[in-house]
Each structure stands twice: as C-alpha cells, then as structure tokens.
Swiss-Prot record:
It is a multi-pass membrane protein. Glycans are attached at N5. PANTHER family: OLFACTORY RECEPTOR 52B2, OLFACTORY RECEPTOR 56B1-RELATED. Residues 1-27, 78-101, 163-198, 261-275 are extracellular. Residues 49-56, 123-141, 220-239, 297-323 are cytoplasmic. Odorant receptor. This is Olfactory receptor 52B2. Keywords: Cell membrane, Disulfide bond, G-protein coupled receptor, Glycoprotein, Membrane, Olfaction, Receptor, Sensory transduction, Transducer, Transmembrane, Transmembrane helix. It comes from Homo sapiens. It holds the Pfam family 7tm_4.
Length: 323
C-alpha cells in the first residue's frame, strides 16, 4: 500500500517586475504616479479633517463620504508605495504572506467602496424622496449599522481568497507580472487546478458589485422620478445638485472597473503592459479625483476647507512662532 505525501510549496518571495515591457520608462512613469498618490492622500485627509471638525457636516451623507475617503487612502496606500519602491529602488521582492495580504486589501477596498457608494445612494434616495422622514429613517444607530454592514460584507466576501491562495502549490515560477499582487494574477502561477480560484475570484465579487450597481440605478431612477415631479425648476435644480458629485464619483469608480474587467476577458490583443498600467491608474486616479469633485461641487465642503485654512492662517499670525 503506497502513501503519497503532497506538500504545498509556497515560495519565500514573489518577484514583482513592475510593468513588463516598460521597464525603461519606470522612472518616468513614477513621477506622475507619485504626484497622483500624494494628491490623493492629501485631498482625502483634508476631506476627513474638514468633515470631523465642521459640526454642520455631521450628517449621514458626509459620514459615508468620510468612509469613502478612508477607503481611497487605504486602496492607494496598499499599492502605490510598493510600485514606487519597484520603480525607484528596484525592490521587486515581496514575501508570500505580504503578497497575499496586499491582494486581500486591494480586493476588500474595491468591494467596500462599491458598498459605500450604494449607502450614499440610499442616503440621497431618502433625502429627496422622503425628506420629512430623513432624520427618523437615517438615525445614527442605523448609520452605524450600515457602516458595520459595509465593512463586514467586504471582509466576508474577500476573506476566503486568503485560503484559496494558501492551498495552492507554487512550483513553477515566482514572478508575478504586475506591480502589485492580486488574487487571479498570483493564482495563475500555481502548478495545480485553479478553477475554484477563477470562479470565486470573478463571480462572487463581480456579482456583488453588479448587485450594487443595480440597486444604485434603481435608487436614482426613483430619485429622478421624484425630482421631475417637483413644481418649480429651482427646486428640481437644487435637488439634482445634491446628487451631482455623487453621480460623478459613481461614474469614476464603475466605468474604469468594468472597462478593465471587459478588456481582461475580451481584449486578447491588448498588450499586457497596457492592462497593468491601467490597473495602476485605477487604484490611484479615482482616489485623487474624489475629494476634488466633492470640493468643487459641494458648497459645504468648500466652505469647510476655507474655514479650516483661515483658522490655520490666524493661528500662524497670532502664534509666537509666527510673529
């Protein structure tokens, strides 16, 4: 009677080459990527500080916006610093567990942002379609439960990815053709059947995100129906203006994500470096643009930022250090 011992081999490190085919341009690509990342972190940090400090912004809509800002910082910080280390310092190696952790947070932030956008759509639906019931429907306990549901759902959907990767033996190559780790890209290096990884990696998160998109579309169809029933044009314009920034953020999040998904599946003739370059831009550009969009289109945010900077200027002028 023979016994077969199957050993699951995990490499000590994976190698991230950056953007294959564009190695000669890494240093030039790093400059706009670094500027985008700095702008994203500063913009979202300012947004969070303003929402926390300004009492008139202590409402559910801006609470969800602050959650989105935190997710944006985490998403870009999970990926961009490592990419810059590859471009600048040739730091191509990443430990196996660190690679799995990075992939987990990348996917969790993506699913989490989708859920937050759904929560913000629900907030706008209640505010416009049932304004008299807004304060009774979206109480702070309810908002807290929604926030907890967003985090719990994101964690539970992506957590199995850790075990799906750790169960695989990697005995072929340890070179991940990317600048950061993501589930399917790492799973394809395994010398075993990855059917479960492919089905789970694509179907479960995508189904949840598509469900979010459908619910957001239903919310905004009901919002538009309610808006066009308003008696005056000024009332319609005011109602729509409260949704403008949210709609911009929704488009910036979902359009690139579905474009990337479709090109991965059907764009067989698109060079690999184009896919990876778009993936790097996707985790950096929307987080940079979100606070700018809300700052430009939302009067309360603009006034809050101006108020905070005025306070800083006043403190600098009256402080002994500034005199």
């Amino acid at each position: 009677m023979s016994h077969t011992n199957v050993t699951i081999f995990h490499p000590a490190v994976f190698v991230l080459p950056g953007i294959p085919g564009l190695e000669a341009y890494h240093i030039w690509l790093s400059i706009p990527l670094c500027l985008i990342y700095i702008t994203a972190v500063l913009g979202n940090s300012i947004l969070i500080v303003v929402i926390v400090m300004e009492r008139n912004l202590h409402v559910p809509m801006y609470f969800f916006l602050s959650m989105l800002a935190v997710m944006d910082i985490l998403l870009s910080t999970t990926t961009v610093p490592k990419a810059l280390a590859i471009f600048w310092l040739q730091a191509h190696n990443i430990a196996f567990d660190a690679c799995v952790t990075q992939g987990f947070f990348v996917h969790m932030m993506f699913v989490g942002e989708s859920a937050i956008l759904l929560a913000m759509a629900f907030d706008r639906f209640v505010a416009i379609c049932a304004p008299l019931r807004y304060t009774t429907v979206l109480t702070w306990p309810v908002v807290g439960r929604i926030a907890l549901a967003v985090i719990t759902r994101s964690f539970c959907i992506i957590f199995p990815v850790i075990f799906l990767l750790k169960r695989l033996p990697f005995c072929l190559t340890n070179i991940v053709p990317h600048s950061y780790c993501e589930h399917i890209g790492v799973a394809r290096l395994a010398c075993a059947d990855i059917t479960v990884n492919i089905w789970y990696g694509f179907s479960v998160p995508i189904v949840m995100v598509i469900l979010d998109v459908i619910l957001i579309a239903v919310s905004y169809s009901l919002i538009l129906r309610a808006v066009f029933r308003l008696p005056s044009q000024d009332a319609r314009h005011k109602a729509l203006s409260t949704c403008g920034s949210h709609l911009c953020v929704i488009l910036m999040f979902y359009v690139p994500s579905f474009f990337t998904l479709l090109t991965h599946h059907f764009g067989r003739n698109i060079p690999q470096h184009v896919h990876i370059l778009l993936a790097n831009l996707y985790v950096a550009v929307p987080p940079m643009l979100n606070p700018i969009v809300y700052g430009v289109k939302t009067k309360q945010i603009r006034e809050g930022v101006a108020h905070r900077f005025f306070d800083i200027k006043t403190w600098c002028c009256t402080s002994p250090l500034g005199s």
